[in-house]
Amino acid sequence: MEIINYLIIALSVLFGASLTFFSGFGLGTILLPVFSLYFPIDIAIAATAIVHFSNNIFKFGMVYKHVHWPTLIRFGLPAMGAALLGALLLNFMGKQAVIYSYVLFHKELSITSLKLVIGALMLFFALFELLPKLSNWKMEQKYVPLGGVLSGFFGGISGHQGAFRSVFLTKTGLSKEEFIGTSNAIALVIDITRITVYATTIFKIIDFNGIKTSLLIGIAFAFLGTYFGKQLLTKTTIKGIQRVVGALLLVIGGLFCAGIL
């Protein structure tokens, strides 16, 4: 690989990790397409999981004191169980029928009914973060487990658990520090599960050309992005975090509807 390729990886990770510190998602969404430019998709997925997991451990060391344990238990545990069900349902559904396909930058992209539904849901939930009247709505504590189930299920079936987790967590009344700490703790547990699933592939990728340097750069710049995010924590508010979450949901939802993700 050339130096410019490593630079693209570094800048992508730096940007993604900085955003993820506040939003609770985004690093994997940005990094996977970048890695897939240079490596086979199975290698790219495993490499993304390694960087994501390493960064979540680093981030947890910074924010563990702010984890809101009651929410972690009442929201996180149902979310994890529902995420597994969603992932199993996705596997059961098999290959989706293509509604429309087109070519963009020499790559064939397909729009399926599932992608449209997931994208539409993300766009809908984005309104709850961006519109003033809806952004002030708070979830009653008795509905927190239900929020965990819904976020986990939609996350499991879409492969983007962080996005749905964040939009529900912002409605639980947590402070910005508690939101970041609790979201990270849930993500870390999910990452541990994911790493075990990818273990076989991870052992295979070590000798793949360019992967060691790419991983080292990815992990180092993820740490740097997370550090930058931590420095900006005092300058942001929970409203600011909601806007970041909403903006990312709009982008990712649009990409789903367009068949790019």
Residue ranges and their predicted role:
Residues 44, 84-94, 155-160, 194-197, ...:
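Hydrophobic alpha-helical transmembrane segments in multi-pass integral membrane proteins
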Residues 10, 14, 18, 49, ...:
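Residue-level signature of the transmembrane alpha-helical core
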Residues 69-79, 139-148, 181-184, 241-246:
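Cytoplasmic-side transmembrane-helix entry/capping segments in multi-pass membrane proteins
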Residues 1-39, 128-183:
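Selected transmembrane alpha-helices and immediately adjacent juxtamembrane segments
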